[in-house]
Amino acid sequence: MAPPAGGTAAGSDPGSAAVLLAVHVAVRPLGAGLDVAAQPRRLQLSADPERPGRFRLEMLGAGPGAVILEWPLESVSYTVRGPCQHELQPPPGGPGTLSLHFANPQEAQRWAALVRDATVEGQNGSDSLPPALGPETRPVSPPSPLEVPTPKAPKPKVDLPWSPGDLMEKEELAGRLTRAVEGGDEKGAAQAAAILAQRHVALRVQLQEAYFPPGPIRLQVTVEDAASSAHVSLQVHPHCTIRALQEQVFSEFGFPPAVQRWVIGRCLCVPEHSLAFYGVQRDGDPAFLYLLSAPREAPGRSPQRPQKVDGELGRLFPQSLGLPPTPQPTSSSLPSPLQPGWPCPSCTFINAPSRPGCEMCSTQRPCAWDPLPTASIQQLPKVTRREDGPSLPGPRSLDPLLNLSGNLC
């Protein structure tokens, strides 16, 4: 029987050459459908008697007298895809790229190490052979290639960042991990997670919406900045994250996420957590939003969407305040005197001169700040500017909510 293209038929006597290692694998064409069954094959690495210092890779079929396909080791491309999954790409004209599955991960690791070292030995042209290992021989550490003053061997081929086959395999592994975790298969989940970790696959693991309380619900939000406060109602879902909530407020009202600080249940919220994580489950649950001073834009740049700043709550939410819109200041208005104190480098809050840490975020007072003499400064009472009209229920200061001395989540 004539051998297929890309391989040379050899005698069926494995003892005709020095066999370094032989392993049993399940072989199937790469990218073949699930209906294509894997075929049992025997791979063996042996020294080439006709070319000293060179090696050849042989694939034996099942049964006596089966044709052996063999290739010079330097003509094939061998890639490790996982603990038990390797790929063999014969030279052009052969059977195409083959997927090799090992039953034993230790045997697969030993085989890959020997193929790698034999490839380096062949590229360096060394006459020394790696030690022969039979199927029952205990694995030993392969000898390190000797450093010789020859040009370095070319680096192995690096996989492209994206390819259709690689993407399909990663998605299949992610699906396998999901099904294993959902079904309580700890072993299967560990195997899939190990392969994904070896390939440094970036994943996003989150609970399905079915595990959260039903929505949508109305979230009652008290909004406050350095000048005023207001009450608004937002339609949200309990599975919504704080980051998504920040984007919703940015889209509806123009306050960028960088100036938003959310407090729910006496906890300073983290963008990655969900509303349900902080106890938001039903209509009317309260939340608190404090707006920091808007960050300054870099010179020459303009914001893509309008961004609101301090003092604009009265113009944004006149209905929630029950008041007419705040009148615009006239040119004859005198500027307010500067508030004594030191600005927080983290949240820009103006703190009292005698306060050692920020009242909002507990950041330590800058060492370079030089307070004015206490004799020339009178402690001013802390006030909040309010529009003329009825007082609003709810908190007017962050003090009752942002107890940052130890109650942060």
Swiss-Prot record:
Biased composition (Pro residues): 140-153
Residue ranges of every copy of the Ubiquitin-like domain listed in the record: 217-280
Pathway terms, separated by semicolons: Protein modification; protein ubiquitination
Chain positions of all zinc fingers (RanBP2-type): 338-367
Localization (cell): Cytoplasm, Cytosol; Synapse
Keyword Signal: no
GO cellular component, one term: cytosol
Annotated segments matching region Disordered: 121-164, 315-337, 384-409
Superkingdom of the organism of origin: Eukaryota
Listed Pfam families: LTM, Sharpin_PH
Transmembrane segments: none
Stretches the record annotates as Interaction with SHANK1: 173-300
Keywords of the record: Cytoplasm, Metal-binding, Phosphoprotein, Synapse, Ubl conjugation pathway, Zinc, Zinc-finger
SMART domains: ZnF_RBZ
Stretches the record annotates as Self-association: 1-178
Positions of post-translational Phosphoserine modification: 163, 302
Main location: cytoplasm
Record's subunit section: Monomer and homodimer. Component of the LUBAC complex (linear ubiquitin chain assembly complex) which consists of SHARPIN, RBCK1 and RNF31. LUBAC has a MW of approximately 600 kDa suggesting a heteromultimeric assembly of its subunits. Associates with the TNF-R1 signaling complex (TNF-RSC) in a stimulation-dependent manner. Interacts with EYA1, EYA2, SHANK1 and SHANK3 (via ANK repeats).
Name of the molecule in the record: Sharpin
Native species: Bos taurus
Gene symbol of the encoding locus: SHARPIN
